[in-house]
Amino acid sequence: MASTSDAPHAMAKRYFDDLVLREKSESRWFSADETEMIEFARKFDPQYFHIDPDKAKSSPFGQIVASGTYTFAIWNKLNMEVNGDIAWIAGLGFNDFKFPNPFLPNTPIQSTSHLISKRESKKNPERGLVIHEYKVTDENDGTIFECTCPALVARVTE
């Protein structure tokens, strides 16, 4: 019977050795209306171009745009819908964290993940290190958010 030292991940379907280098996955499409973006920003990022449609018209964006924090939260939700079955132990940070274009109200976005690196842990044989490249794009293939993320993933041990 297979087991892992990371009991919370016992129900996960994909462990380190199940992950295929260069595998890609895509989320469903998602869009949010202006009201949802404003409600979030009022609580967590109350800058005028996130919360006030009239003042936002004079911003560099010319309209309401989603908070980067909101965009990141939506990315995480979409990513977990396609990669939530991985036996994650911990994320180790984010590299090249960018928001090259704003997330606009009622604009469909999609998250993609690409496994660009994987290796067994040098310190602990019960885990591996992976690096995913993540990107959120709109329907015109414009990049809304991107980053790379190293993370530890459980390995199945006997």
Give names to the regions the model predicted.
Residues A2-L21, F99-P108, T112-E158:
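HotDog/MaoC-like acyl-thioester-processing domains
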Residues A2-G93, E158:
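Hot-dog-fold acyl-thioester-processing enzymes
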